[in-house]
Amino acid sequence: MIKVLIADDQELIRQSLSIVLNTKEGIEVTDTVANGQEVIASVRKNRPDVILMDIRMPKMDGVQCTKIIKDNYSEIKIIILTTFDDDEYVYNALKWGASGYLLKGVSMDGLTNAIRTVYSGQAMINPDIATKVVRLFSQMAKADYVVDVDQKRTENLTKTEWKIINEVGRGSSN
């Protein structure tokens, strides 16, 4: 059984999703909440497998909440389910660990499939969003985008390993 938490500031959305998803085989909605702070409290109590998270919510938005959840509960999968496809929202949600980004126009079958897909360890991104992601990735690659490295996790790498990492980062292959 896939345990799902629904986070959206609109009660009608929460209730509708809960009613429909609870009819789907293998899916159980464990809680519905209206903001990011309630997400964190619910995660502590219910430990969902997947969170359906809106972007714009009061008290704490979905992007900030995604970062906090992934920092503390890395095994939980998060699907952003929103009407907003702004580049900044998409980039930051994926940067902080969202496994999916869907627009609210998705069908219920599409949403159910997305839940099962991210639960299995894969990603699910709306086709329009995927186009944005590819464009953003291309822009970053052209700009020699720099990634911060956690020194503690890399202190034992050899010079050869660093050289390989550098080449991969530049897009080289064997």
Language model features: what each stretch is:
Residues 26-34, 42:
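Short hydrophobic/Thr-rich beta-strand motif most characteristic of the beta2 strand and flanking loop
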Residues 35-38, 61-64:
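Acidic catalytic/metal-coordinating carboxylates
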Residues 46-52:
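Active-site beta3 strand of CheY-like receiver
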Residues 53-54, 65:
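Active-site T/S-Asp motif of two-component receiver
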